[in-house]
Structures are given as structure tokens and as C-alpha cells.
């Protein structure tokens, strides 16, 4: 099956997470948490030319956190509570660095491929 999805840079990351939402640990996250994670992935993409450690520090900076909160229209307390939940899943480290699986840097297009290893059901 092949699907072509028209999108823009900001929406891409939320759509990416929505496609993967049925796979742990994303299954544990609610919509607001996915919104924050998508925004962090977007900023990670914007700063892709920076060294990995520096990019993590920029993502964890007060300025970036404020930008994300304003983009999503949430208070600092709500943001902090949701970030705590995201960090517990291991998708974002305390340093601000995103998990390797979320280090996504699309160009003008991005291709996802799925391989399912399906085990046969054993009848008893």
C-alpha cells in the first residue's frame, strides 16, 4: 500500500506521531502530550544543523519552551506536567534530547516503511 500525504513542516510531525500512535510508548500519550512532542520534534528539525548536544540544550532552553507553550496555547504548569509524562516514556531525555526514533529530518518529502513480522496463531 502506498499513501501520499500533503502536509507542511509544522503539521508533518504531528501526523508522523499519529501514524505511530498505536506503537508503544506512544500509546501511553494523550493528545496534548503528542502535541508537545510534535512541537519539540519540529524545533529539533529547525535546529538540525547544530551539534546533537547543543541542539538538546536549545530544545531545553526557556526560550524554546516558551515558544512551544505559546504555539500550543498552554500555561507553564500544564506544559511542565505534560513534559514530565513524556520524559517518563523515555522519548525526551532530561537534557532535552529527543529519542533516536524521533530524530526525524524531512526534506521536501519523507518516506516511512513498515515491516510486520507476523507469527502464526497456534490453535490449541
Predicted features by range, described:
Residues 28-29, 74:
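Alpha-helical hairpin
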Residues 97-124:
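Short, cationic-aromatic polyanion-contact patches
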Residues 22-23, 43, 71:
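Alpha-helix C-capping/helix-to-loop hinge sites
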Residues 10, 16-19, 34, 66, ...:
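Intrinsic disorder/low-complexity segments enriched in polar/small residues
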Residues 5-12, 32, 60, 78:
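Non-membrane alpha-helical secondary structure
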Residues 1-28:
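Positively charged, structured surface patches that bind polyanionic biopolymers
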Residues 29-63:
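Short helix->loop/beta-hairpin flanking segments within DNA-binding domains
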Amino acid at each position: 500500500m502506498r499513501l501520499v500525504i500533503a502536509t507542511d513542516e509544522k503539521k508533518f510531525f504531528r501526523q508522523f506521531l499519529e501514524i505511530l500512535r498505536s506503537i508503544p510508548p506512544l500509546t501511553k500519550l494523550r493528545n496534548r502530550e503528542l502535541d508537545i512532542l510534535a512541537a519539540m520534534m519540529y524545533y529539533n528539525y529547525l535546529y538540525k544543523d547544530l551539534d546533537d548536544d547543543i541542539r538538546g540544550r536549545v530544545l531545553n532552553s526557556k526560550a524554546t519552551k516558551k515558544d512551544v507553550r505559546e504555539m500550543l496555547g498552554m500555561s507553564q504548569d500544564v506544559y511542565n506536567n505534560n513534559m514530565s509524562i513524556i520524559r517518563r516514556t523515555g522519548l525526551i531525555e532530561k537534557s532535552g534530547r529527543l529519542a533516536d526514533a524521533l530524530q526525524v529530518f524531512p526534506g521536501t518529502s519523507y518516506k516511512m516503511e513498515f515491516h510486520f513480522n507476523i507469527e502464526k496463531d497456534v490453535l490449541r
